[in-house]
Design a protein with these regions (language model features):
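A structural signal for short, hydrophobic/glycine-enriched beta-strand patches
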Residues: 2, 35-215
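Secretory targeting and sorting signals
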Residues: 1-36
Length: 215
């Protein structure tokens, strides 16, 4: 019953806020570069991730709101609204015993690379510990991004986490320390919804958290 009530309130907020965001998005469309992914999906997700209920200190509200979002490879509008303050967060996945990356992690990095190239002012955080052969997930991700043309100074390693919950908690410390205004989490389709719930819970409503699915 409580979940139903929360979901109903979220829907009311979403409907009420959508016209406002549409007006804002229209302004962005005029002033922002043509690369902005402003579509019905990203607009609705943008409402939900901010005033629609996902930016909340209440976990039940976060869970209900996050379930209403559409997982997509399209880039969130928050990146165009504040590129410099939005951090791109790439989540790790278990390495092979020799320290090399599994295909699932390379897929996440390829998706993050597209975001990073389109938004060259956005800082990047690579999150993951669990070392194999002396190499952490974050270390492997950082090396891959640098090898693919991302400047080293854009990348911050969070190399101690061992779970998605720890990814969120540890990365939140970095985001808070640098005064980030929002975060975009990049991970696999079967991981993103849970990851966004964990990150939104960790930031406790301080900043909006959006997501990008790795194909």
């Amino acid at each position: 019953m409580q979940h139903y009530s929360v979901s109903r309130r979220i829907r009311r907020l979403t409907i009420a806020a959508l016209s406002t965001l549409l007006a804002s998005a229209a302004a962005v469309t005029v002033s922002a570069p043509a690369h902005a992914d402003i579509t019905p999906t990203t607009l609705v997700n943008g409402v939900l991730s901010t005033i629609g209920g996902c930016q909340s200190p209440v976990r039940d509200a976060i869970v209900g709101c996050t379930r209403m979002e559409t997982l997509t490879t399209q880039f969130p509008v928050v990146l165009d609204l504040n590129q410099l303050g939005t951090n791109i967060v790439v989540l790790g996945a278990g390495l092979f015993p020799d320290g090399t990356m599994r295909p699932v992690l390379i897929s996440r990095l390829q998706a993050a690379l597209q975001v990073a190239r389109r938004y060259p002012l956005s800082p990047i955080i690579v999150s993951g510990g669990v070392p194999k052969n002396g190499i952490t997930e974050a270390g492997a991700m950082r090396a891959w991004l640098i090898a693919n043309g991302i400047p080293w100074f854009r990348i911050t390693e969070e190399n101690t986490s061992r779970s998605t919950v720890e990814n969120a908690r540890n990365t939140n410390g970095i985001l808070a320390g640098r005064g980030a205004t929002s975060a975009v989490v990049v991970t696999s389709p079967d991981h993103l919804q849970r990851a966004m719930v964990d990150f939104r819970t960790a930031v406790a409503g301080r900043i909006p958290v959006a997501g990008v699915v790795a194909p």
